[in-house]
Amino acid sequence: MLTLYGTELSSRLLLGTARYPSPAILAEAVRRSKTEIVTVSLRRETAGGKAGGAFFELIRDLGVRVLPNTAGCHSVKEAALTAKMAREVFRTNWIKLELIGHQDTLQPDVFQLVEAARILTEDGFEVFPYTTEDLVVGEHLLGAGCKVLMPWCAPIGSAMGPQNIPGLRAMRAEFPDLPLIVDAGIGRPSHAATVMELGFDAVLLNTAVASAADPAAMAEAFANAIDAGHGGYLAGLLEPRDMAVPSTPVIGKGVFA
């Protein structure tokens, strides 16, 4: 089981809700992924007026837990205001905290991120911070009250997959008992399996599913890959070797002079 802020979950896949071809396809993707948490951008959906209301109704009908985010925010003040609005709309203290520092890479502004996390935690929020794999930043986020970290593995929407596996591995080693969710940059089910094999607890996806030729089928493929990667990690993966090692035993074989 995955436990996030005291909530036990069976699925290790968190699914974003943006950019799907239609609400019906989104709903089918959520169902086939078996996710229990979807992320929602309050800023985008409230701007949709009546369409936004229909979207919220769809999410409620799916029976999944909502993790609102502060996507598009560039300042502590902006993120805090968005988080408070999300709490009123969705009636949850959960917030995925995003504070973008660079427009081209969508890299998080980790300095403002720590400040915002502290402010929101003190206001009763349970913060899921979108961050980098930097260990020092991670320590500061824990000091600010976060009990989950969400490091990227590549820029948002890039589909490049994990770009710094040693850094991700170091993060897992540094925070062995903390829930770590890889967020951003996953493009293929194999990418998701790779980070789960490193010992990460879950993966958050959006573009890789929503922009697929068949989003619902891709959601199911990712769910299977995540389960496979996690299962492999628990089973104990064979470490790579520089030289060959015979897999066939030689005991009992005849010796020819």
Swiss-Prot record:
GO terms for molecular function: thiazole synthase activity. The keyword Transferase applies. One of its GO terms (biological process) is thiamine diphosphate biosynthetic process. The keyword Cytoplasm applies. Pathway: Cofactor biosynthesis; thiamine diphosphate biosynthesis. Its EC number is 2.8.1.10. It is found in: Cytoplasm. Its main location: cytoplasm. Belongs to the ThiG family. Catalyzes the rearrangement of 1-deoxy-D-xylulose 5-phosphate (DXP) to produce the thiazole phosphate moiety of thiamine. Sulfur is provided by the thiocarboxylate moiety of the carrier protein ThiS. In vitro, sulfur can be provided by H(2)S. This is Thiazole synthase. It comes from Allorhizobium ampelinum (strain ATCC BAA-846 / DSM 112012 / S4) (Agrobacterium vitis (strain S4)). The gene is thiG.
